């Protein structure tokens, strides 16, 4: 399934990458993946709960489109 670049909640985006697990666990896995890459590490520690389209675009380019 091709996802579009738009604003995503962090749990929502995590569920896109890991649909078979609970949202909280999916977020922990996505956060770990984001922390492993210097381009996306700052996104993992944001205090807000949404990713803007530009941030989603960076995540998709680094991790691949789910």
Indicate where each model-derived feature is located.
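A short, Lys/Arg-enriched interface patch at domain edges and termini
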Residues: 53-66
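Major-groove DNA-recognition helix of helix-turn-helix-type DNA-binding domains
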Residues: 19-53
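Polyanion-binding surface elements
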Residues: 2-21
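Generic detector of short alpha-helix boundary/capping microenvironments
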Residues: 1-2, 52
């Amino acid at each position: 399934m091709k996802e579009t670049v738009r604003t995503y909640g962090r749990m929502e985006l995590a569920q896109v990458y890991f649909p078979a697990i609970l949202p909280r666990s999916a977020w922990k896995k996505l956060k770990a993946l984001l922390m492993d890459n210097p381009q996306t590490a700052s996104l993992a520690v944001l205090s807000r709960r949404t990713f803007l389209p530009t941030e989603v675009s960076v995540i998709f380019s680094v991790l691949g489109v789910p």
